[in-house]
Amino acid sequence: MKDIAHRCGVSIATVSKALNGQLDIGEETRGRILRTAEEMGYMTNAAARALKTKRTYNLGVLFVDPMHGGLAHEFFSAVLDGIRSEAERSNYDITFINNLGSRASTYLQHCRYRGVDGVVIASADFTDPMVTELVNSELPVVTIDHVFNNHIAVVSDNTRGMEELVRYAASRGHRRLALIHGEKTTVTLNRLAGFYRACEALDIPVRDEWVREGVFHDPQGCCRITKELLAQPEKPTCIFFPDDYSYIGGLNAVTEAGLRIPEDISAVGYDGIPLSRIVSPVLTTWRQDTAGMGAAAASGLIGLIEHPRTAILDRVVVRGSLQEGGSVRQLTETR
């Protein structure tokens, strides 16, 4: 790089930015550096493609985690693995965009600085003005589990998933159902619609005091809400948790109350993460195809980048499936 910098009359840092596809340098300077690198035999495959196609072959992944669970959280870890695998299959790199750095720069500015060709929004507050700015920018954007008009969105069938879980609980004789749902997002609203729709179809009364708002991926909050449900004079026979990870808090609350799942109260999760299969009893849950969601998002974004005139801006629904465990008791009578 030192020789390239000397010949072009720029710093080594500027050469590094040009070779890595970052766009915070002038186009003329960038082009001169890439041509010089090619002449001197320093050209990497990525740099050569960038010179030829005017693309960096770098996908941005916006991941904002308000619960600070990080990429270790099983649901998003699987989604991100799907994005990474599909990107690598198409010879793209990925760069994570998040809010851990200085808030002085917006998500869009961060993306431009990193020189990404497009962005998958994997997890974010979709009402955040910085997210809106990014979605409305010139960059191709694909969202996961949220729909913007005139953009590709990859969504799981949350309404159907919740309907199937309610039907399963009802088939086991349960009619006193409690639901702890996540914060008010598109995902939550769709699951609530599925819950109410299935209960109405099965003529199951829904008690308002048994439908409680929590937060996704928050075992502590679910522990507290579960204790409140168990303290009521008439208890539900089955509690629906917002996700499998949050269920751990509910399980702790049940255990602390001297009760057992499913002998004393039944439980249902959502997501189907590996954790749900190693707890005892195995959790009945709705398994989402998380890797499939990530791969579909990356594939849609790459198609949008490479074929902008023919890409279809549509909603891609990734189906899930019921994972039956041992956490829902068969009641001897329906009440």
Question: Which ranges hold each PLM region?
Answer:
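Short gly/ser/thr-rich secondary-structure transition/capping motifs
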Residues: E39-N45, N99-A104, L251
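Short strand->helix junction
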Residues: Q22, G69, G101, K184-T185
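Structural motif corresponding to alpha-helix initiation and N-cap regions
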Residues: T44-N45, A104-T106, T127-D128, P219, ...
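N-terminal helix-turn-helix DNA-binding module of bacterial transcription factors
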Residues: M1-Y57
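Bacterial carbohydrate/catabolite-sensing allosteric modules
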Residues: R7, E39, G82-S90, V135-T143, ...
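Alpha-helical recognition/docking segments in bacterial nutrient-uptake
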Residues: N58-R167, S171, A231
